[in-house]
Amino acid sequence: MTNLRKTHPLMKIINNSFIDLPTPSNISSWWNFGSLLGICLIIQILTGLFLAMHYTSDTLTAFSSVTHICRDVNYGWLIRYLHANGASMFFICLFLHVGRGLYYGSYLFMETWNIGVLLLFAVMATAFMGYVLPWGQMSFWGATVITNLLSAIPYIGSDLVQWIWGGFSVDKATLTRFFAFHFILPFIIAALAGVHLLFLHETGSNNPSGISSDADKIPFHPYYTIKDILGILLLILTLASLVLFSPDLLGDPDNYTPANPLNTPPHIKPEWYFLFAYAILRSIPNKLGGVLALVLSILILILSPLLHTAKQRSMMFRPFSQCLFWILVADLLTLTWIGGQPVEHPFIIIGQVASILYFSLILIIMPITSLLENKMLKW
């Protein structure tokens, strides 16, 4: 009798995706982040579901309902902080996952990569709307500033902003619709992640060498299931440490003040994972230019396959490209730091230089360096 997992219509899909999947024998721990992102999404959906049971999306009671969750609901504080810090873990895994893709040339799987970029945008949109829900000062002013950026779009800008707000300012209508979207988007993300996986399994995984691994495949289970479990345990340990020892480490103290449209906080800034894009936005003095740069800073990832000029897929054997890659990482960390600083000298000029370097590295310097490496290898 044939094994049920190989014949049953549903079990067969699971079997071919997580059990008998032929996997390269040499993929490193940088390939763990896909499964970690899946775990993060599950944690976020579950904690979010329990939070939604107690949260009210009304401007008068939203802040109080979050306080009520933390004070009166059984382990409500734990659920709330797991959800808030779970988002940070989600983005850490996302950035490492994208960085891995850029380093090892995984972007040459075009469909998988493009859906991945779409997923990145969806997660960023979800996180932004989630940050608005507690209705603290930074929630309100963050929502006001970021949605206001759309007014830079010529002709339809101001109408579009009022349409998103549902009125003439960020108010009850905005909060209600943000809650609705914040609830539905994670399920869309889960569906997209399924499609992401579907396209990945059409080609099979890439590996650190960037060379075809068809001649040397091993089954996913037990080799990579056990490896993923180690990654998951480390993720849970980090998240638990963050939640139980310093849950507000990555948050903003201003968000413990209820939203007040009449009082602007001295420094409006988003959560840490958006700071790099926020720094790029602020480094351009023109509103429309800043908005374009903000969108392009992430949309530029779509161009990665077109900007690949190297004859080798991976950066594993390309020392100059490796060097530039780590300069890009350092540049992004610099932008993240600048995004959290006030708009004054010397932070303005540092942000502008870092922004120019970011786009120059991706669009010009790295492709030219790859061509140079081809020449050096007489290819």
From Swiss-Prot:
Heme b b566 binds at residues 97, 196. Its main location: mitochondrion. Disulfide bonds: none annotated. CDD domains: cytochrome_b_C, Cytochrome_b_N. The keyword Nucleotidyltransferase does not apply. A ubiquinone binds at residue 201. Binds 2 heme b groups non-covalently. It is found in: Mitochondrion inner membrane. Pfam families: Cytochrom_B_C, Cytochrome_B. The chain crosses the membrane at residues 33-53, 77-98, 113-133, 178-198, 226-246, 288-308, 320-340, 347-367. GO terms for molecular function: metal ion binding; ubiquinol-cytochrome-c reductase activity. Coiled coil: none annotated. Heme 1 (or BL or b562) is low-potential and absorbs at about 562 nm, and heme 2 (or BH or b566) is high-potential and absorbs at about 566 nm. Belongs to the cytochrome b family. The cytochrome bc1 complex contains 11 subunits: 3 respiratory subunits (MT-CYB, CYC1 and UQCRFS1), 2 core proteins (UQCRC1 and UQCRC2) and 6 low-molecular weight proteins (UQCRH/QCR6, UQCRB/QCR7, UQCRQ/QCR8, UQCR10/QCR9, UQCR11/QCR10 and a cleavage product of UQCRFS1). This cytochrome bc1 complex then forms a dimer. PANTHER family: CYTOCHROME B. Component of the ubiquinol-cytochrome c reductase complex (complex III or cytochrome b-c1 complex) that is part of the mitochondrial respiratory chain. The b-c1 complex mediates electron transfer from ubiquinol to cytochrome c. Contributes to the generation of a proton gradient across the mitochondrial membrane that is then used for ATP synthesis. This is Cytochrome b. It comes from Notiosorex cockrumi (Cockrum's desert shrew). The lineage of its organism: Eukaryota, Metazoa, Chordata, Craniata, Vertebrata.
